[in-house]
Amino acid sequence: MIDQYKHQQLRIGSVSPQQISAWATKILPNGEIVGEVTKPYTFHYKTNKPEKDGLFCERIFGPIKSGICACGNYRVIGDEKEDPKFCEQCGVEFVDSRIRRYQMGYIKLACPVTHVWYLKRLPSYIANFLDKPLKELEGLVYCDFSFARPIAKKPTFLRLRGLFEYEIQSWKYSIPLFFTTQGFDTFRNREISTGAGAIREQLADLDLRTIIDYSFAEWKELGEEGSTGNEWEDRKVGRRKDFLVRRMELVKHFIRTNIEPEWMVLCLLPVLPPELRPIIQIDGGKLMSSDINELYRRVIYRNNTLTDLLSTSRSTPGELVMCQEKLVQEAVDTLLDNGIRGQPMRDGHNKVYKSFSDVIEGKEGRFRETLLGKRVDYSGRSVIVVGPSLSLHRCGLPREIAIELFQTFVIRGLIRQHLASNIGVAKRKIREKEPIVWKILQEVMQGHPVLLNRAPTLHRLGIQAFQPILVEGRAICLHPLVCKGFNADFDGDQMAVHVPLSLEAQAEARLLMFSHMNLLSPAIGDPISVPTQDMLIGLYILTSGNRRGICANRYNPWNHKTYQNERIDDTNYKSMKEPFFCNFYDAIGAYRQKRIHLDSPLWLRWQLDQRIIASKEAPIEVHYESLGTYHEIYAHYLIIRSVKKEIIDIYIRTTVGHISLYREIEEAIQGFYQACS
């Protein structure tokens, strides 16, 4: 439907029998009204044409082939000069065959049928409206018992029949025959009510606003009573108050949406368009039919039987009619929701029939599969793995995914650079994976962001923009800091990749959706890009160091001369001297050559402003040299001073892990400063 703002929208709810009839009924150009499905047949076994008034009738649902009627005559669609607009022999209109995707039919039920969703689903809407137990309503719907109608105080057939049960045995066989004569159902319906018709009558008699007033008054009265001191009674009162609140909310919803309660009981059963429940011919001439067709046939068979019992048979026992009404109710229940009342209906191969509920609900249902989430072009999907070397705003795309997503852009680049004469040649180069293809792909990806999405998308951080780069393998590489926004981890999670095509979408991705633009939670303002457990453990290992202390290895200013260019092992690690390094590169190079450990203490020459060294810490030791220079040794650094007490060099006691962390922080600060400037 289209609202007042011209927005397309879908609304699900109850509709009146008049609305169902308006959807399904159509008037042919000759004035004939069609739309009711009366026969349980699909296709004729000889001609393979739809049966008239059947589940695939062309008069009701439209022609199978555009502009061709059931007789085989052809008319041009949309030609105003063509007359008539339908075939006078078969009654099929000359219209587009796509009408069979939305043209509905209906089945006129011989008795009212309760919609099983409103009766059996929890909470039961019908039970809430009538304020009766669900088991009692089920017994009434499925004709297990009846209730007497309020009538005047006069002799009734119910009383008469009760008296006959105690009379002489000679009347035993004649009295039931009297109660099953033609026309007795009129007297029976005057005094008793059963089946879905009884539910419909009670729902039709309800005044919704009166229900709200009485429910609110009762809820207020229960609230004023207070606690009784009995735990069981208090729980009972609490459950009653919750029920009254749910009842008032339900009634308000019906009033707001202009839905009548009696619409929860069906008199007309809609028939889906045939293209939504097709019969397909496969190899070998075999036919495959949708399960819904079999369930519709079951409903029509039982409904026609009940119609015959009510109209043609003269001596039909009342119990037989009630039993047939129950069968019609069960057939409609199976069509709407197979298995909701217990054992589901199965076919000859012991396979459960898929009902209407099974078609639309679940992950593979109509809504989540094709309406809410559908497959789109320029998208891909793969497993995510950690990419610790990536920047926060970058992601790694596998070559297979990248070349498929950006194939049209690569083709345009090949043609513009005169590397391919046409699209076919460009596609051949891509299939053969020539080196120039990857070069152009990298150029295209540099200026084109991509969107990463992880289901379920519960908030706006569930889909963010990244700058893609090519990586080896078949998994998407992701920076670990952005995982919290996606609620993702690296234990097999999958993410979807989308390419924004329009300039507006690309601008929105760059300005609003880039990962480095979403560092704070939009809900509470807390940081969303925080280190994960893996990163915290890595930082701890990186900065833990060896805590032997400076006194464990007595200082010797010439220990750096004893540093050997050889690997170390655990046997001589404890007795090894602490080496001296002049810069970062020497220390990291020694670690990569496995001459020192990640947490090995070392002395590193530090270019530091002398004004920063203003600590009042007393040196642990002071060593003097023959030339007058001396070394002041502190807990984590040492200072070499001249004779005039001027600082010559400063060495800090650190580890390779601390050095690596410091360099990363320094590069990040420098990059941020350059970006801001």
Swiss-Prot record:
GO cellular component annotations of the record: chloroplast; DNA-directed RNA polymerase complex; mitochondrion
Residues noted as binding Mg(2+) in the record, renumbered to the chain: 489, 491, 493
A Pfam cross-reference name: RNA_pol_Rpb1_2
Record's catalysed reaction(s): RNA(n) + a ribonucleoside 5'-triphosphate = RNA(n+1) + diphosphate
A Gene Ontology molecular function term of the record: magnesium ion binding
Keywords carried by this UniProt record: Chloroplast, DNA-directed RNA polymerase, Magnesium, Metal-binding, Nucleotidyltransferase, Plastid, Transcription, Transferase, Zinc
Cofactor annotation comment: Binds 1 Mg(2+) ion per subunit.
Binding-site list for Zn(2+): 69, 71, 87, 90
Signal peptide interval: none
Stored InterPro entries: DNA-dir_RpoC_beta_prime (IPR045867), RNA_pol_asu (IPR000722), RNA_pol_N (IPR006592), RNA_pol_Rpb1_1 (IPR007080), RNA_pol_Rpb1_3_sf (IPR042102), RNA_pol_Rpb1_clamp_domain (IPR044893), RNApol_RpoC1 (IPR034678)
Example GO biological process: DNA-templated transcription
Function recorded in the entry: DNA-dependent RNA polymerase catalyzes the transcription of DNA into RNA using the four ribonucleoside triphosphates as substrates.
HAMAP family cross-referenced by the UniProt entry: RNApol_bact_RpoC1 (MF_01323)
Name the record gives this protein: DNA-directed RNA polymerase subunit beta'
Lineage per the UniProt record: Eukaryota, Viridiplantae, Streptophyta, Embryophyta, Tracheophyta
Gene (name only): rpoC1
